[in-house]
């Protein structure tokens, strides 16, 4: 765990120090925008640091996607997660996740210890024509699909 003082953002230098101190780190997770304080982490700069390491770069953009700059590919983000209920100002109940090619490669070689969050199941169902959810979708997801 890399803790920072309340109301401050993690720095790229602190991330680099943590990664240098422990070569077994498999992933770094950063909250882009901390809702209660409004503090935004420098995800672009942290992404530059992450390019030198094999660890996955995971960013929580629940309260920032759509309102702040979060260019997933350009910033080197391997996994980006968001929800509909905060910055997107949509009804709650939907989540979106992106995986980089590197994250997909790593996911293919892991047997997840979770049923619902098995990304391989989502990919397999998403490749169908028409795409579908591997599990019962939320009512908001069904409505979104109809609108699109």
Identify the residue ranges that each predicted region occupies:
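Glycine-rich, charge-decorated loop segments at or immediately adjacent to ligand/cofactor-binding or catalytic sites
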Residues: 65-75
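Generic secondary-structure signature for well-ordered alpha-helical cores
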Residues: 17-24, 51-55, 77, 99-104, ...
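Active-site cofactor/substrate anionic-group-binding motifs, chiefly glycine-
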Residues: 1-9
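Short, acidic/turn-prone active-site loops that include or flank metal/cofactor-
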Residues: 4-5, 63, 84-87, 102-103
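Conserved active-site segment immediately N-terminal to the catalytic lysine
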Residues: 73-85
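Short beta-strand segments
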Residues: 2-3, 29-32, 82-83, 98
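Active-site C-terminal subdomain of aminotransferase-like
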Residues: 87-148
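Active-site phosphate-binding strand-loop segment of PLP-dependent enzymes
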Residues: 10-64, 79
